[in-house]
A protein has these predicted regions:
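Short, charged low-complexity linear segments at domain edges
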Residues: 375-405
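Short, solvent-exposed alpha-helical surface patches in well-structured domains
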Residues: 116, 205, 266, 292, ...
Length: 634
């Protein structure tokens, strides 16, 4: 991976410091989107900014364009704080392709190469330098920044994944806490902090810990309209996942999240045995294997990465067509961040999750057993409750999700609940039976029991344990025989989610919450979702992806005729060859959307090719003639 690059530019790309001209000439886009223009101007003018923008919303341009503008104005280098080596590699590779002099400093560089990058930095030739916080805060690196600052060559500090500084957030990283030192040391250097998600607590923590009290706050819509949200009741979760992948995403790239390393290994192996191109990823694998698997995911088509949440942050792959969860995340922020890794190219993607009572039990137990203070536990319980409300919702998932982030919207018409509203039943009587059973079993034995035993009592199943405890003599024995075991599991799960039942101790026993009294007295009605016995069919206004090869050869955006499809296929073949030669993911060369526009419009000269969105001056110079040759083929 090159860390610095040729500074030659296309004749049309004058060294303008105007942000819009930079956007057009360097990156090949005609206009800024949403809040981008206001953010860029704030930073170009030397102000601080805190940017909350969803994944795929164009956060990188919010600091890359100002970095180029300020460098061209003689103000020096932009330092980008990034937590992941993979992200640094891909960002520098993409900037290289666009003709922007940039580099990274991390443990992947040999000593000679690292020293060469440092010389480029100190000479003022770099526009952007990417580094991790732990490297930036070393005495050696701070001394280099001191030297740059004294010469007026420390232009801007960009802090990516800023939520990592917050202990209230879903991905706290202790090394981020030291970044406030940079503002104390260089108070006149403007800063931009960026994150894809942050609730009020996390947002306040970012502002406090990074001393961004004077920063202008930019909040874009959290809506990802191209993502369809589906949450199903767990029943043989791996089989449910396989059915989802085969029915909807055969041949597509995607991510499957699991909570434990063992489950990652087991699921990846099982999916591979079922014929899918599935790979495991978790922190327990050695670094070389993690890097190999990540590179395959980024560079190959149709790879399914089965991973813990150690995977995903900073992954810029635009054509991830699905994100699946086999376990419940910790909170809505984590769910939003993880599902947001799908559909970065703006094309349709699925967020699919299987969820059951054991998920609720496990998450509650982890909170209760953590060594955190009671205030932190209380906040985490509240966040989990919000996620459970989303999982059990009868109405639009998107409305629920956006409401959590303080944004109001209309029903999307595209989530599972909108496409097929769930059946709801009056479960007041069943809930009272379940709560009474929990109470009677505890009263008889002096301690609580788990869901399996309680269901046996409710259904009148005389197991050894039921007989030993004398629970077959209770008035609640057999009072729920008319309800199937799976439905009782749904009742108990939803009572836990509603807060009427508590999960206690290392054995995950169930106990009554204070709110259960009102239900038992018949003062509060209980409406629950009907337990699903078969996969719910949902129709797509956007069309199915089923069938061999799935969506991998399907061009995005507007449909192409037969000739256009042939051009698109030829362009993808050409792009793959270039990507291999440059050791880059294919999307760094050109996104699918750019190739699709080329295939549709079939430009026959450099000027018209340069008008395609995503074709900047450097790429036009480097690839223009070759692309025209591909497009001219019959």
């Amino acid at each position: 991976m090159p860390t610095t690059l040729n500074t030659a530019t296309h004749a049309g790309a004058a060294s303008s410091s105007d942000p819009l001209q930079i956007l057009q000439q360097v990156f090949g886009y005609t206009a800024f989107r949403g809040e981008q223009a206001a953010v860029v101007q704030q930073v170009v003018d030397g102000g601080d900014a805190l940017v909350l923008m969803p994944t795929g919303g164009g956060k990188s341009l919010c600091y890359q364009v100002p970095a180029i503008a300020r460098h061209r104005a003689g103000q020096g280098v932009t330092l980008v704080v990034s937590p992941l080596i993979a992200l640094m590699h891909d960002q520098v590779g993409a900037l290289d392709e666009a003709g922007v002099v940039s580099a990274f400093l991390n443990s992947s560089l040999e000593g000679d190469e690292a020293r060469r990058v440092e010389r480029e930095l100190m000479a003022g030739r770099l526009v952007l330098l990417y580094a991790a916080p732990e490297r930036i805060l070393t005495p050696r690196f701070l001394a280099m920044l001191d030297s740059l600052h004294e010469r007026g060559l420390f232009s801007l500090l960009a802090i990516d994944e800023a939520h990592c500084v917050s202990q209230w957030g879903h991905d706290f990283r202790e090394e981020y806490l030291g970044l406030s030192q940079l503002h104390e040391r260089f108070p006149d250097v403007p800063r931009i902090a960026l994150t894809a998600t942050a609730d009020d607590h996390t947002r306040g923590d970012i502002i406090a810990r990074l001393a961004l009290t004077e920063a202008r706050l930019f909040i874009s819509s959290f809506d990802r309209p191209n993502i369809r949200y589906t949450i199903v009741e767990k029943d043989e979760a791996k089989r449910q996942l396989l059915r989802f992948l085969r029915d909807e995403h055969e041949g597509d790239a995607g991510i499957v999240y699991c909570q434990s390393r063992k489950k990652v290994e087991d699921t990846a192996s099982w999916l591979a045995g079922e014929g899918l191109n599935a790979l495991p990823y978790h922190a327990g694998l050695d670094a070389a294997m993690r890097r190999r698997h990540q590179d395959r995911f980024l560079r190959e088509e149709g790879v399914v990465m089965v991973a813990t949440i150690a995977f995903g942050m900073g992954i810029d792959k635009p054509d991830v067509r699905f994100v699946a969860h086999l376990d419940l995340p910790k909170n809505i922020e984590g769910y939003y961040q993880e599902t947001g890794r799908g559909g970065r190219d703006g094309q349709p993607a699925d967020a699919w999750m299987a969820y059951g009572l054991a998920d609720v039990v496990n998450q509650r137990r982890m909170i209760d057993e953590s060594e955190a203070g009671e205030e932190f536990k209380r906040l985490q319980r509240g966040k989990l409750e919000a996620l459970l409300a989303l999982a059990e919702a009868h109405d639009c998932r998107r409305v629920r999700l956006l409401t959590y982030f303080g944004e109001h919207s209309q029903a999307c018409g595209n989530c599972d609940n909108c496409l097929q509203p769930p059946a709801v039943w009056d479960a007041t009587d069943a809930a009272r039976k379940a709560l009474s059973c929990i109470y009677r079993c505890h009263q008889a034995s002096g301690f609580s029991f788990g869901s399996g035993h309680l269901i046996d009592v409710l259904r009148g199943k005389l197991t050894d344990k039921v007989a030993q405890r004398g629970h077959d003599k209770l008035t609640t024995f057999g009072i729920g025989a008319d309800i199937a075991e799976q439905q009782w599991r749904g009742v108990l799960r939803q009572l836990v989610a509603l807060g009427h039942v508590l999960v206690e101790g290392e054995y995950n026993t169930l106990a009554l919450a204070d709110s259960a009294r009102a239900v038992l007295r018949g003062e509060v009605p209980v409406l629950l979702r009907v337990a699903s016995e078969a996969p719910r069919k949902t129709s797509r206004s956007r069309g199915s992806r089923s069938g061999t090869g799935g969506g991998r050869d399907k061009p995005p955006s507007l449909p192409l005729d037969e000739a256009g499809l042939a051009r698109f296929a030829a362009l993808k073949t050409w792009r793959a060859e270039v990507a291999r030669a440059h050791n880059l993911p294919a999307y760094v060369v050109f996104h699918d959307a750019t190739l699709a526009q080329m295939a549709r419009e079939a430009p026959n000269d450099l000027d018209s090719l340069g008008g395609i969105s995503g074709v900047g001056a450097k790429k036009l110079e480097a690839y223009g003639q070759a692309l025209l040759g591909v497009l001219a083929q019959d």
